[in-house]
Amino acid sequence: MDQTSIQASGGESATASTLKYMPGFGNDFETESLPGALPQGQNSPQKCNYGLYAEQLSGSPFTAPRGTNERSWLYRIRPSVRHTRRFSNASYPLWKTAPCLDEHSLPLGQLRWDPIPAPEERLTFLEGVRTITTAGDAATQVGMSAHAYVFNQDMVDDYFFNADGELLIVPQLGALRVFTEMGIMDVEPLEICLIPRGMMFKILKTGEQAVWRGYICENYGAKFTLPDRGPIGANCLANPRDFKTPVAAFEDKETPCRVHVKWCGKFYVTEIGHSPLDVVAWHGNYAPFKYDLRTFSPVGAIRFDHPDPSIFSVLTAPTEDAGTANVDFVIFPPRWLVAEHTFRPPWYHRNIMSEFMGLIHGQYDAKEEGFVPGGMSLHNMMLPHGPDALAFEKAANAELKPVKLDHTMAFMFETRYPQQLTKYAAELETLQDDYLECWDGLERKFDGTPGIK
C-alpha cells in the first residue's frame, strides 16, 4: 500500500506556512520531528526509539581539527545501505565535471550570454542542469563548476546526491522547495541554499510560472565558510544569525523510487521501494542551509575610491594558501554610492582569478545594457574587463551626489583556477556575438597636454 507522510519538527505536516528553521552558521544543531526520537547523552544507543537506526554522516575526516570537523548523527527509518541497490549507468550529458576540455571552435575571449532557453520538453531539476564552465579536478577535490539550470517538473520519486562536491544553488526565476535528508527549505529568488556533499535531496517547484531557472556553483574543494572580516570587525557582510538550517522532516513513502548519484564525474541510478528522505531526528554541524541575500550588510568607501570587490564576499571556499580561494561567492547588492572625486563603478581590471557572473535581478552598474537577469558572463584570468563605454561616460561625467544603487542583485563565482568552457556553452544560441563591441566607444582622450579631458 502506498502511503506518503511528510512530517516536520513537532509532528506537523510540512507546508510552506509551517516550515521552521534554526538560525546560525556552523552551529551544532539538534532537531527531531517526533518527540523523543533524538537520543540524549549518547550518539548510538543499543536500540533507538521508534525503531530508528543511528547513522553518522561525515563531511570531514575524523581527525580534522575541531574548528573544521563536520559530522551529523541521523536517526532514520532505514539505514542508508537500504537506500541503494545495484547501480546502473545513467547519463546527464550536459552536466560536466572538471577536468573537462570539451572540443569546440570558440576561441579565448570575454564572453556573455542571454538567459538559456526555456525547455520544450519536460525536465526535472536534475535533468535541467547545464554546465557552463569547469575548473580544477573533482577527483582531487580541487576547483569548481558553474552551471545554469532550467526545469519545469518536480522530482517526485527521484532523489539525488552528489559525491563530487557541495551545491550552492542561486534561484533566478521561480521559487524552489528543497527537500533534503535533514529537512525542507523553501528558497526563492534573492535567496540561496547550500546542499552539502553526499546529502540526499529532491527539488520541487513552487509557484505557477512556466519555467524555473537559476545558477549552481558545484564546489569540489573545501566547504564554503564565512570569510574573515579582518579590520572590518565583528559585524557586517553576511552575519551568522541570518543563515537558516531546516528542522528535521521526513518522508514516509513506500513506493518505487530512484536514487541518482554523481561520483567522480559519472552518473549512476539505483531503484528502491521507498523514499530515502527518512531522517526523523538529527544532531550535528554538517547540514544544509539557506540565506537571504537581502540581509547582507555591505561596507564600502565613504570618502573616495572604489574598494576591491572582495568586500562583497558572502561565502568563501579556502585553499591551503591563505587568502586564495578555491571559489568565492560574491554579490553586488543594493547600496549607497557616496565617494567623492571618484569613478564609482567597478574599475577596469585584469585578474589572476577567473570570474563567472550572473544577474538575479535588476541592472549591474558596470553594464546597464546587455547583461540581463538570467544572463551570464565569463572573464577568465588575465582577460581585461570593466565598464562598457556607456557606463564609463555616464559615471565619468555624473554629478557626484549620494546615489542609492537600488533594485539590483548580481553575483560572481570567482576561482583561482581557469574556467574551461563547455561545448554546450560555446555553442549556446544565447551567446552574444557582439559582446566585445560594448567597449568600442572607449576612445583615446590623451593628447599630451595636461588637464582633465
Curated annotation (Swiss-Prot):
Pathway: Amino-acid degradation; L-phenylalanine degradation; acetoacetate and fumarate from L-phenylalanine: step 4/6. One of its GO terms (molecular function) is homogentisate 1,2-dioxygenase activity. One of its GO terms (cellular component) is cytoplasm. Fe cation binds at residues 349, 355, 385. The keyword Metal-binding applies. Gene3D superfamilies: Jelly Rolls. The keyword rRNA-binding does not apply. Pfam families: HgmA_C, HgmA_N. GO terms for biological process: L-phenylalanine catabolic process; tyrosine catabolic process. Keywords: Dioxygenase, Iron, Metal-binding, Oxidoreductase, Phenylalanine catabolism, Tyrosine catabolism. Transmembrane segments: none annotated. The active site is at 306 (proton acceptor). It catalyses: homogentisate + O2 = 4-maleylacetoacetate + H(+). Its cofactor is Fe cation. Homogentisate binds at residues 364, 385. It is an enzyme of class 1 (oxidoreductase). Its EC number is 1.13.11.5. Involved in the catabolism of homogentisate (2,5-dihydroxyphenylacetate or 2,5-OH-PhAc), a central intermediate in the degradation of phenylalanine and tyrosine. Catalyzes the oxidative ring cleavage of the aromatic ring of homogentisate to yield maleylacetoacetate. Hexamer; dimer of trimers. Belongs to the homogentisate dioxygenase family. This is Homogentisate 1,2-dioxygenase. It comes from Rhizobium leguminosarum bv. trifolii (strain WSM2304).
